[in-house]
Amino acid sequence: MNGEARSRVVDQEAGSTPSTLRDEDHPSRQRLFGCLPYDIDLNPLRIVMAELVGTFILMFSVCGVISSTQLSGGHVGLLEYAVTAGLSVVVVVYSIGHISGAHLNPSITIAFAVFGGFPWSQVPLYITAQTLGATAATLVGVSVYGVNADIMATKPALSCVSAFFVELIATSIVVFLASALHCGPHQNLGNLTGFVIGTVISLGVLITGPISGGSMNPARSLGPAVVAWDFEDLWIYMTAPVIGAIIGVLTYRSISLKTRPCPSPVSPSVSSLLR
């Protein structure tokens, strides 16, 4: 069997359409610039960009609903905030879920690295992309709507202790469901996955909004804090979601008797997307 035939067999076994592209012709291995003497693998780059763009969409949507309400002279309604966060997650999951997994949240990335089989080597890349996306979205939101960045920030409405524990508990609920979708018998929900994730995000915002501002995401809180240069009580939103996410994964693995990490989904290559 020649090389072309073997390539067709491998493609058919993988469920993709047959392709006669050589390795050096695959878009994921092309040279970005002709002056470079080596090929660059585009897969890590596009995964990082997917997380950055996805987090940008999520954060800009949040900035939009907060700013629009502020400009209209009203107060941000909890239901509007929850629906906006949930719908934006639905959009992003369907847009980039097949590329990066659509974590959009450093706490989810860390929790899946600890217990879910996600490679630690990619954790810094994901967190950097998520933080940059949230910060860029806040900057754009401030410029577009002409508001102060501090209205995007998350602050405890009651005590720091209450905010800490409500963020921890809500994040554990969100990640508990995410673990079930990733590892459980319902991992093949197909087109319903995005709506399920978006629904639980909305639930989390409804639970946490009156107490902590509804973050459950270190990047979502860090972006506005950096732009406003106000880091008061930021430690709550940096630590509680991470601890809660780890508890969520650990709880699911304990009650489902999972003894091994769930396999991390393999992101498709650029070449397979373009065939």
From Swiss-Prot:
GO terms classed as biological process: borate transmembrane transport
PROSITE patterns: MIP
Sequence motif: NPA 1, positions: 105-107
Membrane topology: Multi-pass membrane protein
Transmembrane segments: 47-67, 76-96, 127-147, 161-181, 192-212, 231-251
Tissue: Expressed in floral buds.
List of residues that carry Phosphoserine: 272
Ranges in coiled-coil conformation: none
Record has Ribosomal protein as a keyword: no
Region described as Disordered: spans on this chain: 1-26
Extent of Basic and acidic residues compositional bias: 1-11
GO cellular component assignments: membrane
Keywords, ordered alphabetically: Membrane, Phosphoprotein, Repeat, Transmembrane, Transmembrane helix, Transport
Function (record text): Aquaporins facilitate the transport of water and small neutral solutes across cell membranes.
This protein's domain notes: Aquaporins contain two tandem repeats each containing three membrane-spanning domains and a pore-forming loop with the signature motif Asn-Pro-Ala/Ser (NPA).
Similarity remark: Belongs to the MIP/aquaporin (TC 1.A.8) family. NIP (TC 1.A.8.12) subfamily.
Designated name of the protein: Probable aquaporin NIP7-1
Naturally occurring in which organism (per UniProt): Arabidopsis thaliana (Mouse-ear cress)
Encoding gene, per UniProt annotation: NIP7-1
